[in-house]
């Protein structure tokens, strides 16, 4: 019976009777995420693409391992003393402070207002980085070698969740079991968009067997630019809201950020062929004329001036479920 190997970066099934000392190619280290770069602590290769990170071939050979790594156990908090409910209640008067209501109360502008391109401010660090890239882009001969139809032995399959490598002509007839969706990491949970088997353990996520069968993809055929996720966050002051998108070497001539009083559309092209897109229905109202974008070598900052100096409960306006309930109540 074939068993699943739980070595990091492997995820293949193996026969215990034929398991040898060099049957498994895996990563003995741990995954490392730093400044939008992803890699393994045991090797030097880094990438910003999560799918490319998952397809990094292991750097160590050894035996397949069928033992599932233990998940991190949360510490159990126990108390030896039994206290009455009256003792557990706080001995002070509680004050519940509600978040400010959305700005719809002050006549929220229509989302159909015309969009305006925000001013782009390009930093000196980005200009220097782009100049260096232009000089290095002259060496296109190395890229031409990658465009050849010849597949090298040991090339890893580019399909998500597949860890098979090219061994020869027999690999062309082999069935590929892979994930047709994209990897998603949200609030500590990791899963594929195509099957949504969620887990908080990274090793378990890497070992998830694919949900789709097809042919291996030994070479990437990029039809132009591809949309990829980017790490981004936001913060606010009394008068401004700032969104930071961590995309390196963005191209100002191909990027744009447009907005009206309540909507924000972000389109960033970075690292030559990658795109990041985000459409945000803003929680509050902004002053478009006093808002701008700062582009640096490591990130893009979108600074939006608030129309009123008030705290936003969140960046995006939540779905209007309450409004739908109110409509149902009035019709009853």
Curated annotation (Swiss-Prot):
Residues 2-77 are annotated as: Interaction with PPP5C. Zn(2+) 2 binds at residues 27, 42-43, 59. Interacts with HSP90AA1, HSP90AB1, PPP5C, ROCK1 and ROCK2. PANTHER family: CYSTEINE AND HISTIDINE-RICH DOMAIN-CONTAINING PROTEIN 1. Residues 64-81 have a biased composition (Basic and acidic residues). Residues 5-64, 157-216 form the CHORD domain. The modification Phosphothreonine is found at residue 47. GO terms for biological process: chaperone-mediated protein folding; regulation of cellular response to heat; regulation of centrosome duplication. Residues 62-81 are annotated as: Disordered. SUPFAM superfamilies: HSP20-like chaperones. This is Cysteine and histidine-rich domain-containing protein 1. Residues 227-316 form the CS domain.
């Amino acid at each position: 019976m074939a068993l699943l190997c739980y070595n990091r970066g492997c995820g293949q099934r193996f026969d215990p009777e034929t398991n040898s000392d060099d049957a498994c190619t895996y990563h003995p280290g741990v995954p490392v995420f730093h400044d939008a770069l992803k890699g393994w602590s045991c090797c030097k290769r880094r990438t910003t693409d999560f799918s490319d990170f998952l397809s990094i071939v292991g750097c160590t050979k050894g035996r397949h391992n069928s033992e599932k790594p233990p998940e991190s156990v949360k510490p159990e908090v126990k108390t030896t003393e039994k206290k009455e409910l009256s003792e557990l209640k706080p001995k002070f008067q509680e004050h519940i402070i509600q978040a400010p209501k959305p700005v719809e109360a002050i006549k929220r502008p229509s989302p159909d207002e015309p969009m305006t391109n925000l001013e782009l401010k390009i930093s000196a660090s980005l200009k220097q980085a782009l100049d260096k890239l232009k000089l290095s882009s002259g060496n296109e001969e190395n890229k031409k070698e990658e465009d050849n139809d010849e597949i090298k032995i040991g090339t890893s399959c580019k399909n998500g969740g597949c860890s098979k490598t090219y061994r020869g002509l027999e690999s062309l007839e082999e069935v590929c079991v892979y994930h047709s969706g994209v990897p998603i990491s949200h609030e500590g949970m990791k899963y594929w968009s195509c099957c949504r088997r969620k887990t908080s353990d990274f090793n378990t996520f890497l070992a998830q067997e694919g949900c789709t069968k097809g042919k291996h993809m030994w070479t990437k055929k990029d039809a132009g630019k591809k949309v990829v996720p980017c790490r981004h966050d936001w913060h606010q002051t009394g008068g401004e809201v700032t969104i930071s998108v961590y995309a390196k070497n963005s191209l100002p001539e191909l990027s744009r950020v447009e907005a009206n009083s309540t909507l924000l559309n972000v389109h960033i092209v970075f690292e030559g062929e990658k795109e990041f897109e985000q459409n945000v229905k803003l929680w509050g109202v902004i002053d478009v004329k006093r808002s701008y974008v700062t582009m640096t070598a490591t990130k893009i900052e979108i600074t939006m001036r608030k129309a009123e100096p008030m705290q936003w409960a969140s960046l995006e306006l939540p779905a209007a479920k309450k409004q739908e309930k109110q409509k149902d109540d009035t019709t009853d």
